[in-house]
Amino acid sequence: QDENFMTKKYLKFCQEFAKEVVLPAEDKQQEVLFMNRAINHFAKNDEFEETAFLNEVMQNPEFIPEFKNYKVDKGAKYSIEDVSNFPIANAAVTDVRRTLKNTIVLDTNIQIKLDFINPESAEKFVEKGWDEEKQMYYYLVYFNKEQKS
């Protein structure tokens, strides 16, 4: 089990945690943002250290014990049950980043695509709210100008 294997397996585990725990507890935006933070943590570090990872990536501290419990339950499936430190393989981070779904699909046939390169933008410039009058959720997106494509 080399660093490539460990990096991919740990990120796949994070993906499942995001889908099975973060999404039901929060929403699709938070699921995508969690994976954004996880990928970026791996991208900017050469060594993985689980405590530092959890402190940086978990914006909701209540998810830290849930993550640890989830790792006890599902870690063996990803061969990471006893792993908390390993060297990070940058090529593996790039491979996993390509496979991630970063689109919020709404029931109104509208899709919002969030960029994995700059996750801070999604947190700073996208807000979710509830409209009492329409009895619907909405996303509010802030920007300076549209890019002509």
Where are the regions a protein language model picked out?
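C-terminal, beta-strand-rich globular interaction domains
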Residues: 69-149
